[in-house]
Amino acid sequence: MGTPTPYSAHSPRDSESSYFSHTSPPHGEHEHDEQEQSLLERNNSSHYGTPFDDPAVSTDSLRRYTLHDDGPAVFAAPPYQESEAASENTFRARSNGDKASREGSRAGALRRYGTRKINLVQGSVLSVDYPVPSAIQNAIQPQYRDAEEAFSEEFTHMRYTAATCDPDEFTLRNGYNLRPAIYNRHTELLIAITYYNEDKVLTARTLHGVMQNIRDIVNLKKSEFWNKGGPAWQKIVVCLVFDGIEPCDKNTLDVLATIGIYQDGVMKKDVDGRETVAHVFEYTTQLSVTPTQQLIRPQGNESTNLPPVQMIFCLKQKNSKKINSHRWLFNAFSRILNPEVVILLDAGTKPGHKSLLALWEAFYNDKTLGGACGEIHAMLGQGWRKVINPLVAAQNFEYKISNILDKPLESAFGYVSVLPGAFSAYRYRAIMGRPLEQYFHGDHTLSKRLGKKGIDGMNIFKKNMFLAEDRILCFELVAKAGFKWHLSYVKASKGETDVPEGAAEFISQRRRWLNGSFAAGLYAIMHFGRIYRSGHSIIRMFFLHIQMLYNVCQLIMTWFSLASYWLTSSVIMDLVGTPSTSNKNKGWPWGNEASPIVNNFVKYGYVWVLTLQFIMALGNRPKGVKIPYILSYLYFSLVQLYVLILSFYLVVGAFNGGMMDFNFDEGVGTFLSSFFSSSGGGIVLIALVSTYGIYIIASVLYMDPWHIITSSWAYFLGMTTSINILMVYAFCNWHDVSWGTKGSDKAEALPSAQTKKDDDNKQNFIEEIDKPQADIDSQFEATVKRALTPWIEPEEEGGKSLDDAYRNFRTVLVCLWVFSNLLVTLLITATGVDKMCLTNTSTTRTSWYFEVILWITAGLSLFRFIGSLWFLGRSGILCCVSRR
């Protein structure tokens, strides 16, 4: 075939260098290492700061491998190569949608390259090493590249494997392997990033944050584990699992190609007719791209340099949902690598400083810890500007309170009901067996194999349960027969994630969360008996029973929350606004005559807007009715504000003697009797303190009070909204078990691989294009340009149609829910059901119900607070004795 002709090289041009000095538009990311930023500022002579080539090489060699080579001469392609090249070019042109790229691809089809024979592993597995661009090779520090134990191809070649099998069949026996296992390295920590269609900014935020965390681990000075038995970086593997070629953002692939873990044009659609299920790339890199499209590379021997990071990139050919991505992670890659701890991250979640180390330390110091999670907080933007948006502010407050009250309480019991898939960790040997088996029942790709036990054989309740599959995994882990695994919350580990900023997106997200958590919560309660088969101690079992009772109480309160919010609001309006002997015949705030009238109009509006929610929710199109939803948010928020003002007025009036005053003059007993009277303001005061007061006290104790100042207003005003809009929409769409994502199975643009027999007719091989290094470097420059260009937000896609059978179940569920809440309301407030109740007047029944609701609310809040205090004290003690 011949060798390529010599080609000219030239020095970097200033105009080209300046092209990469830009930063992307703001995208909620405003922080990165000062050290790394300084490296970029003082190295601006080329796209990578300075040429990557080894300074020891000659000038000619240096010129030959800069990023600005013109490329080799053009040749004609051989006949057998034309179709393959055309397929590759079609994929690249479709991926980029860029005229210049398409023209370059057509020019590339005219080149005539040599070929090489690639023997298939065990005659069926295609696994090939491809040279990486010279710039990436020479970015590796000499101390790693030239080390005695270094493998020659680890830093010079990217490994590609076409997996034509199910994840369960990705085994050593079938000829599949991974580099860390080939190099006989122990994998202590496997960090997995699952991806659907996130843009390159979100992906870079997560990946760069992970690499910074790995640097924190490698730079540990005093460690009992990481500094023994080989370099720390060799014990860590980062695995990216992308859910399908078609939904994948092609700019994100350019970012991965820039750091060396991906190359365009090497994927094969099938091997001898066997369809490729996943494309697996492997490389060890020291490069990273920041969310602001800045390239980070090593500089000398500074401690701020990123260490080598072993990466596995799994690009699934078809979109088959997140749970299938986890099956590739746990059943394919983890079985070969056998890691001790697996950390799960979603693309877009940025781990905080030393957060991954804190998660790992929790497992290292507690041998019975099966799973853990860190604190997830909302991304608020530069200067916390996003808290101006009430939806973002409310979610920020919700996340914070969950991390201060709920997670510590559950951690104290040993069973955290949900370890969020966006930021959690598991001990691999703890989830092996039944936990993973039950977890993967929700994988659509296993439906034929599992039959009735699979997703196609499930009823609608179980399908909703798998919208919160991480809750199922948590329960199965704690209930694992014969073991005593427990779950924990790690306060020192923090992750930042973006949250929905629009009403339609927020409603769709909460539909999945609420329905999934409700179904999974019932599942855990109904299968609680399996806890007795576990190996937990008697003390742990006792506390698990207490937690189960707490969860049952919370579930009941959630079910009847629709009636509770209505009754609470109407009772407070009547107590303050309707003149009576209890308030000394003073109607407030509109006067004796106007206050009852205004309150009635508020109530009628409440019922009308609530009815509107059912009508809109049954339409299943929140994006199509944005304005009515926004107006509904506004109305319920105003009602909540009005009720809060009346509540505080009620309490203040009780203290100053203006209305329903407390008796301070006749002893403690009389005061307590007046304070806890069902017609007094004492119970309202207890309810207010048990919610708002505990939120403030707990936040101060955890030294994280800022959300109280910046975000509490949105959360408190939106409490009614969360029930009347979000829960109504969720239950009315119980039949919809989709994730709201639209998958695609398109991969026609990829070329196929056809095997041939050697002369002895024994060994199967394929003929592969053998590109010269110069061409690889030339094409790489265009990739870098695409990777470092500003990000453009893609347009959103529409929803999907729903099944009629699921609509029927949905209708029955909604009717049952509404009827039960309506029945409670009628029994409490109606005047014609005296004989059915314990009292003879509706006023007495209403006061009694009001008192019970407030006491239960106060009790649950106090219970969460006690658990939070216990966790805080225990964490302080363990912090003094923990090991690394």
Curated annotation (Swiss-Prot):
Top-level taxon: Eukaryota
Name of this chain's protein: Chitin synthase E
Subcellular location: Cell membrane
Gene null: resulting phenotype: Reduces drastically spore production and leads to strong retarded radial growth rates. Increases the resistance to echinocandins. Leads to resistance to AFP, a small, basic and cysteine-rich peptide that exerts extremely potent antifungal activity by inhibitiing cell wall chitin biosynthesis.
Biased composition (Basic and acidic residues): 95-105
Annotated region described as Disordered, given as residue ranges: 1-58, 73-108
A GO CC term attached to the entry: plasma membrane
Keyword Transmembrane carried by entry: yes
Glycosylation sites: N44, N301, N840
Enzyme Commission number: 2.4.1.16
Family label: Belongs to the chitin synthase family. Class III subfamily.
Physiological role: Polymerizes chitin, a structural polymer of the cell wall and septum, by transferring the sugar moiety of UDP-GlcNAc to the non-reducing end of the growing chitin polymer. Plays an important role in septal growth or maintenance. Mediates colony spore formation. ChsE and chsD seem to play a functionally redundant role in lateral cell wall chitin synthesis. Involved in resistance to echinocandins.
Bias (Polar residues): 37-48, 84-93
BP-aspect Gene Ontology terms: cell wall organization; chitin biosynthetic process
Pfam families in alphabetical order: Chitin_synth_1, Chitin_synth_1N
Enzyme class: transferase
